[in-house]
Every structure is written in structure tokens, then in C-alpha cells.
């Protein structure tokens, strides 16, 4: 998730968020999930397209990464179209921004928590339940564009978040497996 108007103002921000998204998709795949990665929903039109894409893909669960600020009008259409349960991933790339050298673009790359209250409220008002996983992104390196240390893979906040994500992946797999099962049952018969 991100805000389309940022891309021309802050070079590299869009690509950086897409990189984080691909990292998440790859890691969820490693946990056993089949991932349908749309990319960035950054405006209402993209939100509708994303909702149609996820709905057509018949997903069991939506992990929505709050990469930077995004307005709820861009994200709400996704979940109005695709009714799969949503888990907002409020995963910060770093534990601490290097404020002494940061820029607005750098700050926005670490502003993932900003839209979470707005999104939660919009979902609530629309009758859409959501869950939130808070923590750190869990990269094992720092991208070249970053002005701060993003190597957080071993930090407890990342380990805990990825444990929770893994539990959601397993739960979705169980639901998918059981929804395809057909059971026959013959109770006590009387002769």
C-alpha cells in the first residue's frame, strides 16, 4: 500500500515499497503459502483492480502490508470486492530511523504505521473485520537506498511477527483443505 502522489515527489520510494512487498511474498511462499502478489494499491482504481485480481484468484486470506501512508479510499475497495479475511502487516523496516540524516522520502519508507488507524476505522465502519500484526519487517540486510540499519531478521519483534504470519498461513491452508473435503456419514442403523 502506498499513495500514488508520492511516487513523483520521492524518487525510489515506490520501488523500495515494491521490494519490501516482494520480500514479504517470497517469505510467505517459503512458509508454504501460495501467493498472488498484486503489487501496490496506491489509488482507488488500483484498489478496485486489486480486489478483482484477488477475488478472481480465489484467495483464502489477504495480507495487506502497510508500507507507507495510504488513504482508506484506495484500500477499502479491495476488501469490498474480495471478501477474504484481511491481516494488516504493520511491519516497520527498522527499529529506529536515523533522524540525524533522514529525508522526507526516507521517513515515508518507515511510515507504515501511519495508515493503520485510518484503515482499521474504515474497515470497522464498513463491517469488515481485520487483524493486525505489528513488528519489524525482518530483512537480513539493508537495501542500498536506506539511510538506516534495516537488518532486523533476528530481532524479537521480527521473529514474533513472522511466527504470527506463519500461523495465519497454516490456518488458511487448513481452511482451504477442509473446504474441498466431502464427508459421508452413516449413523447408527436399526435392523
Model-derived segments and their meaning:
Residues 1-191:
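An N-terminal assembly and electron-transfer interface module characteristic of large anaerobic redox
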Amino acid at each position: 500500500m502506498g499513495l500514488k502522489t508520492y511516487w513523483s515527489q520521492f524518487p525510489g520510494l515506490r520501488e523500495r515499497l515494491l521490494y519490501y512487498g516482494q520480500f514479504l511474498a517470497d517469505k510467505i511462499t517459503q512458509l508454504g503459502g501460495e501467493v498472488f502478489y498484486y503489487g501496490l494499491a496506491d489509488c482507488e482504481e488500483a484498489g478496485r483492480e486489486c480486489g478483482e485480481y484477488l477475488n478472481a484468484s480465489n484467495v483464502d486470506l489477504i495480507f495487506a502490508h502497510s508500507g507507507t501512508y495510504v488513504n482508506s479510499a484506495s484500500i477499502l475497495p479491495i476488501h469490498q470486492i474480495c471478501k477474504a479475511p484481511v491481516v494488516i502487516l504493520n511491519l516497520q523496516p527498522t527499529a529506529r530511523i536515523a533522524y540525524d540524516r533522514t529525508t522526507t522520502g526516507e521517513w515515508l519508507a518507515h511510515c507504515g504505521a501511519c495508515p493503520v488507524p485510518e484503515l482499521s476505522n474504515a474497515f470497522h465502519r464498513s463491517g469488515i473485520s481485520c487483524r493486525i500484526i505489528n513488528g519489524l519487517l525482518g530483512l537480513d540486510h539493508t537495501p542500498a537506498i536506506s539511510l538506516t540499519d534495516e537488518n532486523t531478521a533476528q530481532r524479537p519483534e521480527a521473529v514474533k511477527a513472522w511466527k504470527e504470519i506463519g500461523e495465519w498461513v497454516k490456518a488458511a491452508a487448513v481452511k482451504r483443505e477442509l473446504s474441498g473435503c466431502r464427508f459421508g456419514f452413516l449413523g447408527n442403523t436399526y435392523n
